[in-house]
A protein has these predicted regions:
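Alpha-helix exit/C-cap motif
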Residues: 54-82, 86-87, 91-96, 137-145
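Low-complexity, S/T/G/P-rich flexible repeat/linker segments used as non-globular hinges
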Residues: 131, 135-155, 259-282
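Short linear sequence signals and composition-biased patches located at protein termini or domain-edge surfaces
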Residues: 47, 186-191, 195-282
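Short, structured beta-strand/loop micro-motifs enriched in basic residues and often containing a Trp
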Residues: 92-113
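Generic short beta-strand segments
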Residues: 91-94, 170-174, 251-257
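Aliphatic-rich helix starts adjacent to a transmembrane/signal segment
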Residues: 7-60, 64, 261
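Short coil-to-beta transition motif at edge beta-strands of beta-rich domains
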Residues: 120-133
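A generic structural motif
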Residues: 87, 106-112, 151-173
């Protein structure tokens, strides 16, 4: 008589297989989640570092054009207000050269000689005119600041100099005596500062001249310390006298919007120092 053999697994074998499958699946799941968190944290860190680098390039490019004169005032100093987390300064927006003979209320600069990201703007920009050895200006070799009342582009410069940009300014006998080729700088009062919006800290910028609302440049930053400024004199010592500032140390400290591989957000800090225009380098 033949005996039928049944193939299969015992209950114990099935339970062992199910247990091993659960262990392997759990390990793979934890590995996947860890990899996902690590990748997300690395992406956030890269984004944060790129954000800080871009912000530092903007800040340094603005500050590099500034100048301060010991004991000077007015147009001789581009730093208007110097704070630890805020700075109001005269920003360079273009430069051109006088063509023809100005009147007491108008200056015409050659379009071909003007260099800048935009044309001069009325009721916001200021024209700094170089005055050399002028008794009427009350000093030698200064930049005389004048508010731009209006801007016109219809008139041309004399001879073959081509189109011009005519700036209407308050009447001044100094303007009428300007010679052709006199440099004219176009500036705008700007502010950089740390501010809070929607519960986060940002580095913002605004045009003080035109009364703009502050707009974010870089962020989110560390609350209270995300943007810090330290002002140094010619000897590299900290100074609170804005006329003695020769370089500015800038610190940007940012934070990721989400958590990293740990429990909290990731923070990064970028430090830089810029030497002001015309500062004597040791």
């Amino acid at each position: 008589m033949l005996t039928r053999c049944r193939s299969g697994f015992t209950l114990a074998e099935v339970m062992i297989a199910v247990g091993l499958t659960a262990v392997v699946a759990g390990t793979l799941y934890r590995l996947l989640m860890t990899t996902q968190r690590t990748t997300r944290a690395q992406a956030q860190r890269v984004e944060l570092q790129s954000n800080l680098r871009a912000g530092s390039l903007i800040v340094l490019s603005e500050l590099r054009e500034l100048s301060a004169a010991p004991g000077g005032s007015g147009a001789r100093n581009d730093i208007l207000v110097a704070g630890s987390t805020a700075l109001v300064y005269r920003a360079m927006r273009g430069i051109g050269f006088v063509c023809g003979t100005p009147s007491a209320t108008s200056i015409r600069i050659t379009r071909g000689s003007f260099t800048g990201p935009r044309d001069p703007q009325a009721d916001g920009d200021e024209a700094l005119v170089f005055i050399e050895d002028s008794a009427a200006a009350g000093a030698e070799d200064i930049w005389l600041g004048m508010k731009i009342v209006s801007v016109a582009t219809g008139a041309s410069c004399p001879g073959a100099l081509g189109p011009g940009i005519t700036l209407t300014v308050p009447a001044s006998p100094v303007v009428a005596g300007l010679e052709a080729g006199t440099p004219v700088r176009i500036t705008e009062a700007m502010e950089l500062r740390l501010y809070e919006s929607e519960g986060r800290s940002w580095l913002g910028a605004r045009s003080v001249s035109s009364g703009e609302t502050i707009q974010p440049l870089v962020g989110p930053l560390t609350p209270g310390s995300g943007f810090r400024l330290e002002y140094l004199d010619a000897a590299g010592r900290p100074t609170t006298d804005r006329t003695s500032i020769k370089s500015i140390r800038v610190a940007l400290q940012g934070t990721t919007q989400g958590g990293g591989t740990g429990d909290g957000p990731v923070e990064e800090e970028l430090l830089a120092q810029v030497v002001l225009r015309n500062a004597i380098r040791p």
